[in-house]
């Protein structure tokens, strides 16, 4: 019984926390991610299209783990 009550309180707390921390609290979860919806309609505006990668011939690997090679092949030098 105690475990059930604790689980109920936890679920209610997490639900309330989601609504309190929403970007637009008047619409609840409906407008939680408005920017992403816009990016889905216009993929050219998406920030994910601008990949942060290293071009071919640049050193990569152990000393410099980031950013990754554009071709995703790294053998001490991006290929």
UniProtKB/Swiss-Prot annotation:
InterPro entries assigned: Conotoxin (IPR004214)
Residue stretches spanning the membrane: none
Subcellular location: Secreted
Pfam families: Conotoxin
Domain of life where this protein originates: Eukaryota
Maturation-removed propeptide residues: 23-51
Keywords from the named record: Disulfide bond, Knottin, Neurotoxin, Secreted, Signal, Toxin
GO cellular component terms, semicolon-separated: extracellular region
Expression by tissue: Expressed by the venom duct.
MF GO annotations: ion channel inhibitor activity; toxin activity
Residues of the signal peptide: 1-22
Record flagged with keyword Methyltransferase: no
Key word Secreted present: yes
Disulfide bonds: 53-70, 60-74, 69-78
Family membership: Belongs to the conotoxin O1 superfamily.
Domain notes: The presence of a 'disulfide through disulfide knot' structurally defines this protein as a knottin.
Name this polypeptide is given: Conotoxin Leo-O1
Organism listed in the record: Conus leopardus
């Amino acid at each position: 019984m105690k475990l059930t009550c604790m689980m109920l309180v936890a679920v209610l707390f997490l639900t309330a926390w989601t609504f309190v921390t929403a970007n637009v609290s008047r619409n609840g979860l409906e407008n939680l991610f408005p920017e992403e919806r816009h990016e889905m309609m216009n993929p050219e505006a998406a920030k994910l299209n601008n990949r942060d990668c290293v071009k071919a011939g640049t050193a990569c690997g152990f000393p410099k783990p980031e950013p990754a090679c554009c071709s995703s092949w790294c053998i001490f030098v991006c290929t």
